[in-house]
Amino acid sequence: LPSVEIATHSYTHPFYWADVDKGIASTAAQGYTLTPPGYIPSLEREIVGSTDYIRQRLAPAGKPVRLLLWTGNAAPTERALAISERAGLLTMNGGNTIASRTYPSLTAVGPLGIRLGEHFQAYAPIMNENVFTNLWTGPFYGFERVIETFRFTGSPRRIKPIDIYYHTYSATKRASL
């Protein structure tokens, strides 16, 4: 599929990137992180290792991996951004845009990104279902409110692009469908 971009989403799906930078294995209260026995978290393994694995074993020949979608709190450290750049990866995620009828304010619209030292982290245009469902604790129908965000950020002027970002596990709850 020529219009599909292959991305890495890391090796263990860390929730706290600052902990990975320190070699600390931590998980969010809700889980969300793989914990291989004996694994010591490493930015190189999470970023470069996962990218190399996809390039060598999963991607079609000639199809590059050029994107890292940050996991968890999507708050990489400056060093994580530097490693990503050296690996030839663009990066994106975070930002927490959730403007809706509940939060009808431009203050609920995240910026385009944030500068960390010499690096720039591009934020996702609109957040995934986790933000709308309180980190997948409910209400599980919460992601339907993303339509309110699309409307809020699109009129009277488009201030954010539209993207649909969700995890396939959200189909495990009837309310989320």
Protein language model features and the residues they cover:
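Metal-dependent polysaccharide deacetylase catalytic core of the NodB/CE4 family, i.e.
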Residues: 1-75, 79, 87, 94-104, ...
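Catalytic grooves of carbohydrate-active enzymes
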Residues: 37-44, 48, 52-60, 65, ...
